[in-house]
Amino acid sequence: VWFGFTSFAAKGPAMGRVTGKVAVVSGAARGQGRSHARMLAAEGADIIAVDLCADIETNEYPLARPEDLDETARLVEKEGQRAFTEIADVRDRAALSAAIDRGVAEFGRLDIVVANAGICPLTAGLPPQAFADAVDVDLVGVLNLVHSSLKHLQAGASIIVIGSNAAFMSSMNTTGIDGGPGGAGYAFAKIAAAHYVNDFALALAKFSIRMNAVHPTNVNTDMLHSAPMYRAFRPDLKNPTREDAEPVFPVVQAMPVPYVEPEDISEAVLFLASDAARYITGQQLRVDAGGFLKVKPWSGA
């Protein structure tokens, strides 16, 4: 005991930071979603993992497959936790709600909501449907997951929305990237999701339910390493490769890195999900290697 506080060393065997909790993660089959599910499981949470596991026509790069979701479940179970998986489209409120209900029936509770599913149809020349698809997944999908989870949440629950550094840019063209209608839809969706977190967090606060957003920069996932993203960063080339595009990736960060790892985002998710963040709500946490600092001048605290 030191100044009235018990030292960590005196508390006995360490427990995971989310031991005994249950988390639902959308877009859990691969990339950031898999990383979030695995890290939460490593810290003691059981996982309800949902994913579309199919492609979307205007999104040029391939999305996850059922076997990817199975692998996420295997990794969760390898951490000693239970996994409930279901193929579900975040754009379909009824189907998503039913999937969550089944997961909660299996595990008995729901404490953590991670709205991670997203697409980035960042290809110039696509039809207007690309804007609609980006908004339907990246904004409506967030609302559907959160609203379908509400009836299961009690005081102490934590909702985390995975946004994007694009939420703090005036448009996708801030960095010289022409993303077409899909890129514009992506930026709009992320801006709107950030505003949603701010306003809904205030409404949830009196129920002791917390809500925060995490805004990554480039993340080392399949979304970044895709043909449309390479073309966005190297519009001077017809068919740029990773080797062509990667030297340009650092343009959106202040720190000299091309991207961050999925685990860097998962660490923020884990913190916000844990009781260590019990009084943190309504925040826009940027894990962006200083990207925000490059596009937004200081305007006071």
Positions of predicted regions on the chain:
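Short C-terminal tail/terminal secondary-structure segment
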Residues: 8, 256, 269-270, 281-301
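Canonical Rossmann dinucleotide-binding motif of NAD(H)/NADP(H)-dependent dehydrogenases/reductases
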Residues: 16-54
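Catalytic loop of short-chain dehydrogenase/reductase
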Residues: 119-123, 160-206, 217-220, 226
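Substrate-binding pocket helix/loop in short-chain dehydrogenase/reductase
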Residues: 122-135, 249
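Alpha-helical segment proximal to the catalytic Tyr-Lys
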Residues: 151, 202-203, 278
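Short, small/polar-rich loop/turn modules that mediate ligand/substrate recognition or access, typified
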Residues: 205, 210, 280-282
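A conserved structural motif in NAD(P)-dependent oxidoreductases
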Residues: 238-243, 253-265
